[in-house]
Amino acid sequence: FLYHAESIQESMTVNSSTMVKEFTNPLKEPIDDDINLFDFLDRRAQRDPDGSTVEYKADGGWKSFSATQFRDLVIALGKGLIGLGVKKGDAVSIVSRTRWEWTALDMAIMAVGALTVPVYETNSDAQVSWIFNDSQATIAFAEDDGQRDKIESIHDEVQSLRKVFVIDAGALEALQAYGKEVSDEEFWARKNDAHGDDLATIVYTSGSTGTPKGVELSHRNLAFLCLSAMQYMPRACAWPDRRLLLFLPLSHVFARFMELLSFCGTLTLGLSSDMKTIVKDFESFGPTLLLAVPRVFEKVYNAASQRAGKGIAGKMFLRAADVARDWSKAEQAGEKLPWRGRLAHGFYELVVYKKIRTIFGPNADFAITGGAPMDANLSHFFNGIGMPLLEGYGMTETCGPVCVSLPENNRIGTIGMPMSGVTAGIADDGELCVRGHLVCRGYHNHPDVTAEQIVDGWLHTGDLGDIDEDGFISITGRKKDLIITAGGKNVSPGLLEAAVMTSPVVNQCLVIGDRKPFVAALVTFCLLYTSPSPRDR
C-alpha cells in the first residue's frame, strides 16, 4: 500500500550518491527509536489499560481486546515461544490472511527477539519453500489445514523447520501451554535483550528476476517510522477516538506498519479480510480514515455511475462529477467557484455526494491511497465530494510510507512531503532517493544488492521524480521495466512475455497493464503450414 515501487530491482549500473536536489522534513522533537516494538503495546496498556485496542468480527458483531488484555495475551504467547526453544534471531513464519491471531503472534515473535517472516496465503509451494529456506524458518503458523498441507508438502526441502501450528486448530492455546513453566522475568529479560538495531522481520518481495528477496527491517526502522508518523500526521493516528479498519494483507509491510502505528498511537485496530463484506464492515466498524489502493476508489466511482444509468439520473451524476472536480480545482488554486457553481455543489451534496460518502461508513473523513499512480481526475472528484484521497509513496525497503499528502496540505498530482525526519533527494540521473532511519538494513543474503542499492545511506528507489521548492514530491517515471497495475501489484513483463513466447505458435508478445485493473498481452502468431506448396496454403 502507498507503494509505487514495492521492491528494488537488480541493475547492472552503479548508483551514484550525488544529489542535485535534496529536501529534509525535520523532526519536531527528538525520537527515541532504540526500543523493542513490543514497547508500543506495553505503553498503550499503561496509558489506556481498558480502552478497546484490537477488534475483530465474531458472532455477527465486533468483539474487542482492551490494551491490557492484548498485551497479556502477547506475553503469554512470547513465553510459549521461549518454552518451545525459539532463540533470539530465529525466524518464525506466519502463513495466513489478516486476522487478530496474526497480530498477536507477530507481536509475540518480535517481543522475544525472534524474526517474523510473513508469507502470503496465496504463495505457491515453491515460493514458500524458497522463503523458508532463505530465512531458515524454524517454526511456522499456518492459518488452516490447506496452508498446513502446503507447508507439509515442502517440509522435506526445509531442513530448518521444526514445527508447524494451525491457527484454526488451536495454535494459540497450544503455544501458550509451552510457556506455562516460563517466568515473567525470563520473558522481560528476552524482551529487553532485543531492541534498536536488532532485526524484527524479514519481508520478502519479488524483483524483476521473479526471485523473492528478503528485506531486513529492524526494530529501529519500524519504530522510527511510527514515531515519525505521530509527528507528521497526528490527525490520522494521535487524535482521540481514531479507528482503522485494516483489510490489507498483514504480509504486506504497509499493513504491518499500520498495525504497529495503532499501538503507538490512539487508533483502535479493526481486522477483517473478507472483501465481500467490506462495505458492511465500514458501516458497522466506523473507521475514521481509509486505506486502499486506487482501484478501490475507481470501483466506487464506476459503481455510482452505473447505478445512475444513462437517463436523467445518469446525466445528473455526470454533471455532479464535473461540479465536484471544478470545486476541487478551485480549492487547489486557492479560489472559490462562482455562485452558480457553489449553489450546484450544495445541491449535489444533498442528492449525490452524501450518498457516495456513506459507502465508507459514518466516521471517515479522508482516505490514504497508493500502491499505483492515482488519476488526478479521480482525486479531484473525491476531494470535491468531501472525501479527500491523500496520495502517498513508499516501499518495502522503507517499512512503509516515505511521504504522504495531508488533509490540510494536499496537492493533487504529488505524493506529498517526506515524513518527519526523512530526507528525499533527486540524483543526477533523476532517480528519487531516500535517506533516514526508515531505510532497511539491506537484503537478506544479498550483500551485493545491498551495496548497490543503498549508497552512502541513500536508498535508490528506481523511480524518477522531482521535488518542488516546498518539498512536495512528484513521480515522473520509472527507471525499471516494471508494470504496476491499478491494484498496486508489481508485474515483471519480461517473465510473462518469455513464458508466452515458448509456444511454437507465438511470434511476438507485448505485456501491458500499467495503471490498469488487468494484465493483458498483444500477441502476434506464426502461421503454421502443413502443405509445402504456397498455392495450397
Give the label of every model feature segment.
Residues F1, T205, Y529-D536:
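Conserved small/polar residues in nucleotide/adenosyl-binding loops
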Residues S11-M12, L84, A111-A177:
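Structural core segment of the AMP-binding/adenylate-forming
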Residues P49-S52, V166, K180-Y204, T211, ...:
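Conserved pre-ATP/AMP-binding loop-to-beta segment of ANL
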Residues T53-M107, S124-S129, Q176-K180, R220:
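Conserved AMP-binding/adenylate-forming core of the ANL superfamily
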Residues S64-T68, A200-C226:
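Conserved AMP-binding A3 loop
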Residues G146-G196, A304-K355:
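ANL superfamily adenylate-forming
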Residues A223-L246, L250-Y353, N363:
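Conserved AMP-binding/adenylation subdomain of ANL enzymes
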Residues P418-T485, T502:
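Conserved ATP-binding/catalytic segment of the ANL
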